[in-house]
Amino acid sequence: MSATVTATPKLKSIQRTALAMLVVAGAVNYIDRATLAVANPLIREELGLSISQMGYLLSAFLWSYAFSQLPTGAMVDKIGPRRLLTAGLALWSLAQLLGGLVHSFNQFFAARLLLGVGEAPQFPTGARVVRDWFNPRDRGLATGVFNCASTLGTAIALPLLTFLMLTFGWRATFVIMGVAGLLVAVVWFALYRDPKSVALTAEETAYRTEGDPPGQRTEVTFREWKLLFRFRTTWGMILGYFGCIYLTWIYAAWLPGYLEIERHMSVKATGIAAAIPFACGVVGGVLGGYLADVLVRRGVSPVNSRKYPAAIALLGTSACTVAAAYVTSNTLAVVFISASLFLVYVTSTCAWALSSVAAPTNCTASIGAMQNFGGYLGGALAPTVTGLIVQSTGSFVLALVVGAAIGVVSAASYLFVVHDPITTAGMDQLSEPAARGAIHPA
């Protein structure tokens, strides 16, 4: 790949603005979804909920988020990131606000389902924005930057939400965050523009498309969307991300509860200790994207530069999760959990970077959303399975070991199922009558 075409000052300005807004929106996204986890003990006490009921509440968001991925990815590719993310921000912020007004399990369950639908466009939008505005050799780090919003938001969430809840109460905290999200929606719509709305020079167009396969289409069709499911790489990404997000959501949903229940920490101490692992995740996410770019520049194929780091980091996450389960020291437990989140976010960033090179441009958000669908099926199961295991055994040890085992299987999926990138020519080949029902080897 030639390195002679570089981004012009105008493109760099667009890139910086887009990434900054994606980070802000992503941080709010994760603060909102973490609010229930941080307020877990307070909400259980006020509403009289059991641990297993809290597990169902934590999973409600994840189920609606997971199943909303499939149509959302295609909608981002069809309609564009600007309008879809604006609508998503507005919807999830209203759902967050409603969370502060509930008085029963069923009302809270409905608000969490709505939150999942609203948050669904965030990361498919990020994948499409990176594909639209960055050269392939620069997409890894750009992906790491927007993806770090997930850990940055969670790291900010723990001390911020703890402060807000201790100062104003958990209900006011939900309302405050809902209003903040509505403001972000207005700013995103005002500042971001899709490429078709921006006048670009030939040099700028060359930078954006250099290294991409020829014959790229502009919008995804329903036929192309369906064909993505007939490629082994799509299924490798879906199965691989399942374990990544399962492990992530053990910690995202239960880390505060784990530190309080298993490690007997106070609410105040938990707010500080639980922020450390997610801060490590921010670093891991950015370094994962940087590593993918370095490997591409050293001649590793775009797909392999993503899938191998993703698999290796996921194996490391599983090992550290088992270690965290068995150490007796609270300090060592936080150290191993920090290492787990550092590594799992290396995997997460490499997975999203993979979505920017694994399919044609017009299918970027679609395949990213399919991957995210698989991931959040795992994410939806994690809080419920963890809650049921803890309630049954009285300990988090078995729950963490189960998560680690799932991570090993998903790492194998990245290594052995993800293969070649999906091409427009390959999709056209599968459209022929003779190929009906076949699975493409890519």
Where are these regions (language model features)?
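A late C-terminal transmembrane helix in Major Facilitator Superfamily
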Residues: 356-393
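Conserved MFS/SLC helix-loop-helix module at the cytosolic interface between two early adjacent transmembrane helices
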Residues: 67-105
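Helix-loop-helix hairpin linking two adjacent transmembrane segments in secondary transporters
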Residues: 146-197
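Helix-breaking motifs and short loop linkers at transmembrane-helix boundaries and internal kinks
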Residues: 48, 80, 101-107, 118, ...
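Cytoplasmic helix-loop-helix junction between adjacent transmembrane helices
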Residues: 111-151
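Extracytoplasmic gate region of multi-pass secondary transporters
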Residues: 36-37, 231-288, 345-348, 352, ...
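Structural signature of the two symmetry-related core transmembrane helices
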Residues: 83-97, 304-322
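Extracytoplasmic
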Residues: 17-51, 251-256
